[in-house]
């Protein structure tokens, strides 16, 4: 059982880039994308804590991630990971966020956002497996790789249950629209969990001019199924990532506390 955030930094050059998985996925699913970014970045792969003690919403989880990894240059976030990334960016712990099939508030999901807590019972009672992984990915997944996409063990499913219930129990992250944060949105046109219509609502909460990309044939986990395409879109964004901004006293931003 992982009682704390576990992370691995891959060798590379350039900005320090944190890879954040979704609600029930494993950080290991980012490996293919991370390898393709190593010539322009230093990727960090993260695994969230497990067990009843891990019933933390996105804000509390962002605090745990910050305590483990410290500040980063950018975050590449999938699904629920976008909420965690938004907390980090709003607190000044990340200068850029790439949203891959992601959101920062449940309202971005439309009516289905009110049912986000149901992802927990679905994970426990539905017992996700190859079929669920294929639906999320929009393509067949090798049995050995299914655990990278959906929760397959009882511990993972129960952790997903606890965390899904915790999401609505805390305030959502602040809007990033008025902050000096560089963002980019990548969305699969076959995403059945976070539909493409979500992007319009998400972009409205991000800095003006945030670029949007739609990947044809990609489902909910484009970083897993389309790592080359994602890397091609992320490379120029990482290269253009603005240098750190020194904020005056008129624009305070609360920092997460690292212990």
Residue ranges, per PLM feature:
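Conserved HGGG/HGGXW glycine-rich cap/lid loop of the alpha/beta-hydrolase fold
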Residues: 2-52
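Catalytic histidine-centered segment of alpha/beta-hydrolase-like enzymes
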Residues: 55, 218-231
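Short beta-strand/loop motif that positions the catalytic acidic residue
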Residues: 179, 185-187, 191
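Conserved alpha/beta-hydrolase catalytic His-Asp/Glu region
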Residues: 126-177
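Short alpha-helix in the alpha/beta-hydrolase fold that links the catalytic acid
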Residues: 32, 181, 195-204
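Acidic catalytic loop of the alpha/beta-hydrolase fold
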Residues: 189-194, 221
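Flexible "cap/lid" loop of the alpha/beta hydrolase fold
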Residues: 90-124
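Gly/Ala-rich beta-loop-alpha elbow adjacent to hydrolase catalytic centers
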Residues: 76-85
């Amino acid at each position: 059982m992982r009682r704390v955030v576990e992370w691995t930094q891959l060798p590379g050059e350039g900005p320090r880039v944190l890879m954040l998985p979704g609600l029930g996925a494993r950080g290991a699913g980012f490996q293919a994308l991370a390898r393709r970014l190593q010539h322009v970045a230093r990727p960090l792969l993260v695994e969230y804590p497990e067990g009843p003690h891990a019933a933390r919403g996105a804000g509390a989880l962002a605090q745990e991630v910050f305590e483990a990894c410290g500040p980063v240059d950018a975050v590449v976030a999938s699904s629920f990971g976008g909420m965690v990334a938004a907390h980090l960016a709003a607190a000044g712990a990340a200068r850029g966020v790439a949203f891959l099939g992601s959101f920062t508030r449940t309202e971005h999901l439309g009516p289905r956002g009110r049912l986000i807590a149901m992802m927990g019972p679905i994970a426990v009672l539905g017992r996700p497996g190859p079929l669920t992984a294929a639906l999320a990915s929009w393509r067949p997944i090798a049995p050995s790789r299914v655990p990278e996409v959906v929760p397959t063990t009882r511990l993972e499913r129960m952790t997903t249950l606890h965390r899904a219930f915790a999401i609505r129990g805390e305030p959502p992250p602040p809007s990033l629209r008025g902050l000096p944060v560089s963002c980019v949105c990548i969305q699969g046109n076959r995403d059945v969990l976070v539909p493409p219509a979500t992007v319009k609502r998400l972009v409205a909460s991000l800095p003006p001019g945030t670029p949007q990309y739609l990947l044809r044939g990609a489902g909910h986990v484009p970083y897993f199924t389309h790592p080359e395409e994602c890397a091609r879109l992320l490379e120029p964004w990482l290269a253009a990532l603005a240098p750190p901004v020194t904020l005056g006293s008129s624009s305070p931003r609360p920092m997460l506390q690292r212990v």
